[in-house]
Curated annotation (Swiss-Prot):
Keyword Methyltransferase attached: no
A Pfam family annotated for this UniProt entry: PapZ_C
Binding annotation for GTP: 59-62
Species lineage: Bacteria, Pseudomonadati, Pseudomonadota, Gammaproteobacteria, Moraxellales
UniProt keyword GTP-binding, yes or no: yes
Protein known as: Nucleotide-binding protein ABSDF2931
GO molecular function list: ATP binding; GTP binding
Domain of life: Bacteria
PANTHER family xrefs: RNASE ADAPTER PROTEIN RAPZ
Keyword line: ATP-binding, GTP-binding, Nucleotide-binding
Coiled coil regions in record: none
Protein purpose: Displays ATPase and GTPase activities.
Similarity section: Belongs to the RapZ-like family.
Length: 283
């Protein structure tokens, strides 16, 4: 077996959706297996089936004792192939909204606990698995399409480094899956120009406004210089992806402009993917 993926994380963060994406990519997927049974089942599948890619869904319904033994389970699985642990997380307010929309109970729910208490308890239970995770994905404000896009990037089979450029708004929270975060809130803000407010950083009026700013141009050059200097080193370290997040206040103007400009400067040398996290909030 060439590759084994363990997909886990907070309930409601998109584990089932991630497994569906992986199934479409050719992975043999099994969900909701008790942790203690994983080594035995993987050994059986490896012996009796000609599987190259296996994805296993694990959640908090495993016992607390099983969770504490996860590092041992991880070592056992490594006998059968390369193992990656994908850990999905989502901000509390997004999880609450998802459970409210689906009307499904949290796995730890009972009549003595609030939903927020269940979320916080689950985080503590999952710490042993989170510690072993090799891939972290924050699914806050991300659609299933976005999740597929991120999984494709982070699980790329080639040795080519994929650069993910992500714009975001600080008022919606810092992305938890970022490798580097650049803050551009000090740049002139088009939001305060009523004629520019309705546009985004992809629109020409906002581009012209920011290109006229010496600060914006200097910030762009500094970030670009950093990336051009260090991306080759990251690639030599056999990383498949690097997530660079750039934030402004709302995630509509300055960060979007900077991401778009960096994409144009880097795409001739690197495989570049772009995510504008706050697009649904744009006015």
């Amino acid at each position: 077996m060439k590759r084994i993926l363990i997909v886990t994380g907070q309930s409601g963060s998109g584990k089932s959706s991630a497994l569906q994406v992986l199934e479409d990519l050719g992975y043999y997927c099994i969900d909701n297996l008790p942790l203690a049974l994983l080594p035995e089942i993987v050994a059986k599948l490896d012996h009796e089936n000609n599987l190259e890619q296996l994805a296993l869904g694990v959640d908090v319904r495993s016992t607390r004792a099983d969770m504490q033994e996860f590092d041992h389970v991880f070592e056992q699985l490594q006998k059968h192939g390369t193992v990656d642990v994908i850990y999905l997380t989502t901000q509390d307010q997004d999880l609450i909204a998802r459970f409210s929309a689906s009307r499904r109970p949290h796995p730890l729910a009972n009549r003595f606990k609030s939903l927020l208490q269940c979320i916080h308890e689950e985080k503590q239970l999952l710490i042993p698995i989170q510690f072993c995770a090799t891939v972290h994905i924050d699914t806050t404000d991300k659609s299933v399409h976005d999740l597929k896009h991120i999984l494709l990037s982070k699980l790329g089979q080639s040795d080519n480094l994929i650069v993910i450029l992500q714009s975001f708004g600080y008022k919606h929270g810092i992305p938890l899956d970022a490798d580097y975060v650049f803050d551009v809130r000090h740049l002139p803000n088009p939001h305060w120009d009523l004629e520019l407010r309705r546009f985004s950083g992809l629109d020409e009026p906002v581009k012209q406004f920011l290109e006229a700013s010496p600060q914006a141009n200097e910030m762009f050059e500094d970030i670009l210089h950093f990336l051009k200097k260090w991306l080759p080193a990251f690639a030599e370290g056999h990383r498949h992806y690097m997530t660079i997040s750039i934030g402004c206040t709302g995630g509509q103007h300055r960060s979007v402009y900077m991401v778009d400009r960096l994409k144009q400067a880097l795409e001739a040398e690197w495989s570049v993917q772009v995510l504008h996290r706050e697009m649904k909030h744009w006015s």
